[in-house]
Amino acid sequence: MIRSHWRAITLLTLIVVLANAIILSGTFNCDPEILFSGLAVAPQRSFTDACFVDPAVGFLTQALGHLSAQDWLHGIIPWWNPYTGIGMPLAAEVQNESFFLPFVLLLHFHNGWIVQRLLFQIFSGLLTYAFLFLLKLGRPAALLGGALFSLNGTFILTAGTVAGTFLFLPLLLIGIERAHQAALARRPMGWSLIALAIAGSLYAGFPEIAYFDGLLAASWTLLRLAQTPATARWHLLAKIVTGALLGIVLTAPMLIPFLQYLQLGDLGLHGILMAKEISPIAATPLQMLPMFYGALASYSAIAFAWFQIGGWFGCAPVLLALYAVVPKPGAPHRAERTLLACWIVILEARCFGLPGVTALLNLIPGVASTDIIRYAPLSVEFAVFVLAAFGFDDLSRCGPATRGRLAWCAAAFFVCLGLSVIPAWHLLPGWYRTYPALRLPALLSLGGITLTLAATALSLRTGRHLRATQALIITGGVLLFLTSQLGGLRSGHIDRAGIAYLQTNAGLTRFYTLGPFNSNYPAEYRIAAINAVQLPTPENWSNVYNTKLLTPPQSFAYGSTIFMQTAAVRANIAAFEALGVKFIGIPLGGPPLNRILLSTPPPVSVPTTGARGNNYLQMQPGQSVTGTITAPARPASTIYAAAITLGTFKGRSSGPLAISLCAGGQCATGQSDLTLATDNAAFTIRLTPPLPIQPGTALTYRITHAAGPAVALWLSTAQTPMLALQVSATTDQPIRVLHSPAMLIYQLPNPAPYAQASLDACNLVILNRQFMQSNCPQPATLLRRELFYPGWRARVNGTPAAIQPVSGIFQQIPLPAGPATIRFTYMPAHTRLSCAAALLACLIWLLCALAARRHRA
């Protein structure tokens, strides 16, 4: 069977490899670590802004996936992650692919994510081809559908864990079709692929996409049940239910810890804003015209729109899909076409906020708490591409379209195009004035789309040149995929000095970052860091992190500034030390930890001729900003520098930026060239001479951009410049221990040990995070600074010891008098039962598959 399809298999594989040619050749560097870790040195971008939109490919896939792979390769089941937060579940977080064997083992290699994406793309294309061929579409149409799905935009926007679920949607539908055929023929089995697809989609690590794929599969199942004769209907239902139940039981070792984690975790905005969230207006054109703004995956003003669309279809597939929706009389699969069209319309209406649709879909359990506008579009893309394959197959089999059908296609297409483009049309003039370099790629893209549409329309009208049209559509998908890789770096490298320093000196203490060596990346190098970017997050830890460490309280420091969080660290040094934090990293140019920063109130005056956005003030040459600040009631000190958060429009700003400060009749000035500034970061200007201030002194400042291209002053939520004055410290403060090309590392004076006994007379030896030895003159207690979470067990001299919470987040056990050996282990609840159930389900699956094979023989 496979031999007869070797050409299609080869073509689909080559299409995927060609679509990744730039990244495979190393021409541009799309390594997520250099893009997202904050450790890049001298990075130079190429033509566009980014290879991806969602940094989860770095934080989750590359960083935590590598940790999981390392655990497996060392014979450790990756249940627990001691290197993020103060420890938290690893496999239960699911998005890191911990149990997605064997694919997760590829993440042992630094560039394993590339191999993963290639495999996921190839399998997605091949399985879509197989599904369409199973529906009796011709091979050219099946090839077109498989190629389109293997090149879908979601692979670009979210290249990490999300991509692993893609291949299981066509596999699940193949399983349903085989079950349907087996029920009609009264054959046993037929459900094996259903179990495999459901288990794979859950183990792949993204339950939200698996959920919407499951809803589409459930709709397909209802259609097949309605089409099945009554005598075979119960057989079909039994097969599908059997496959679904076995698939769920196969995932029990991961699913049960995940469900427990949902109950004990902080889900952030899920279930609050997700129920009413809709795609922004700027996103409306991107599904049909992904190059509408001249670049893919942009980190500019429209980045949020890219983050909120999930993927795209393109114009030619939409035209073919519309052609398939109204087939000729007697055309096959009319009901299937209607189902897919309804699925597309309903989910598109929900994503873009059509009144009533949101409330209706939220009645379905689970929909209101999922990020539907990002994770439902994959199933919509699949539906569009399947319909496009139907349309192409109609052309191949039935010849050219009638005038009436062609008129319908043209009218419906231009309605869809208008609904996509018109809402965002007003954004274009300002966009291309700000980014004139993007006009050329936008025009080239428009030319390519026009050519492909013309070829498709010609084929619809004449029924000829189908191979050329097919080749043009696939070529357009390949070129679009290659375009995203132009967002890689032409040069630059990762600063590993800080990593090496922490690996040598951190031991069992922890690290905290205000920017560089970003969240979860320390875990890749087995360095414990309290920053965490994952969902869910243990609620007891999240409450402490969000309310006691950050200023103002907020999740993951989103929306805060480096100044605010540096001030929070200074104000809460004792709290950080109590968590075992010894080292803190800040970006170059950021406010130093051993200085106190004074923020400014609203400015006295601002330029009236500069452009003003919601978050920035654009200063033209010769303009100034003035304002006042009052020194706090504290001992006299000296201001020696000012830090201003600037936007340089990707390094285009230049010329001198000056600041003057006056207090008590004395003034100090400073000036620096904007070519030294980092875009969207603090720009420090030293004052000459330093300005002494007294408590309560009124300070007047003036920021002047004398000459050169415009520069943007970032504004706070109060619409004030993000200005901070660095004041010499008068108290014991952190010591700077490393100045590397990418970050500064400070050491806190008194970090708490990882574990300590309640009696000073106890002799405690900490061998590692799980094994310790103690010798106490009398009974005592042991405080272990690891997250208190169900599943932890302790044994003292081989005897179980009860673990009690301390401060809601740490662990405490009793210690006996005399020598004791202490061991901590973690295993989620019901693990033995869930593993036994999964093994039994696997055995049943294998035995039934063998029995069915013998029956066929």
Cite the ranges covered by each PLM segment:
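Contiguous transmembrane helix-bundle modules in multi-pass membrane proteins
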Residues: 144, 162, 168, 179-184, ...
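Active-site lumenal/periplasmic loops and adjacent helix-entry segments of GT-C-fold
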Residues: 23-135, 140-170, 276-307
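Extracytoplasmic
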Residues: 276, 434-441, 445, 466, ...
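Beta-sheet-rich sandwich/jelly-roll-like modules and their strand-loop junctions
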Residues: 598-700, 704-731
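Periplasmic/ER-lumenal interhelical loops and adjacent helix-loop junctions
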Residues: 39-71, 76, 243-327, 358, ...
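Active-site-proximal, structured, solvent-exposed surfaces of multi-pass membrane proteins
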Residues: 5, 735-857
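Hydrophobic alpha-helical membrane-insertion signals
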Residues: 2-89, 259-265, 488-525, 531
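Membrane-embedded helix bundles of polyisoprenyl
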Residues: 12, 122-135, 139-226, 239-259, ...
